[in-house]
Amino acid sequence: MTSQEEITIEDVPSKQRDGLEWILQESFEGWYLMHSKRTLQHIELVRAAMSSGKPIGLVMLKILEGTIGYVYYVAVAKAQRKNGIGKLLLEDSLRIFKARGAQEVFASVEHDNVASEALFASEGFTPTSFSEVSKKHGNLHTVNMYREMLVVPGEILLRKAMAGD
């Protein structure tokens, strides 16, 4: 077990991201594994939880259209799960989004991924829908957001307001 005091969260430059793929392989399968590996190489920001200089978890983030943040993937090494690493990564992500002026943050999780849904709920994320997002942002803007987020059937879209909303 890793104590949270020993953990640092660091940016991972593009050229060093290959060393994180093993965490994705432990965390995802099928389409999610393929997409997470591709996203890892091209996403604007990857943060890794590090313990004794070794990665034990990661999160992939992107700002969509200036004031909207999106959490693409949170993945934690199997041996480190249930130690609060995912929560540390999500808290760090929210600090980054806030510092960059995000007014709201979205994430999507598989409808049967109870652990991920609980993680996001613990930080104030609530389920939303295309129609709810469209009411605020308009249909075309929402379609473009969904396209960038790659929300697929069988996923629940989650939202958190960051500032007076």
Short names for language-model regions:
Residues I7, D11-Y73, A77-K78, L90-E91:
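Acetyl-CoA-dependent GNAT
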Residues G66-I68, E104, E155:
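A generic structural signal for beta-strand entry/edge sites
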Residues K87, H111-S129, V133-L140, N144:
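Conserved active-site alpha-helix within GNAT-family acetyltransferase domains
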Residues V76, K82-R95, A118-S122:
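Conserved acetyl-CoA-binding loop-helix of GNAT-fold acetyltransferases
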